[in-house]
Amino acid sequence: MQSGSANRIIWNLVASRMDRYGYSIFCDDIRNEAGGKLSFIGCYNGVIFISEPFPLVLPKLCVHIHILSPASRPFSSIDVRCYLPGDDKPFSEEPIETPERHDQTELVANLKPDTGAPLFIVAATSLIFAPLKLRSPGLMRVRALIDADQELRLGSLRIEQAS
């Protein structure tokens, strides 16, 4: 009896923490391949070292974004915002088109319910900045405004002067 109670408490804790989340991949190029594959060329692992003095222009920088939401919380709207180091206002603001809420719910309802894994709705997009002007080192941040009221942090890339 006690063990069932503990399992229920743990399950409720896990279920309450399953919320929307996302991530970004920063790279030099994104290529569409045969079979619907994407290739990420020159991926950065949290930092990009710049050998030229600031300000400077990068020929291209790409960001691929994934946003996941529990199936019980379909998206109404998604607005992706990118911020350059030191800026409070986004230099890029891109909406991601989302299907109607009922279409998202119907799609999830048609999935096999016995997978054992939680079901998520996934939104993804690729942003290509060519060229990209950088005034100073610091953090390039990626955020998403979900349903016009929830800001989701999707990652950042530290831009540093190489020594």
Regions found by a protein language model. Name each.
Residues 11-137, 141-146, 150-163:
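Contiguous segments within soluble domain cores/interaction surfaces
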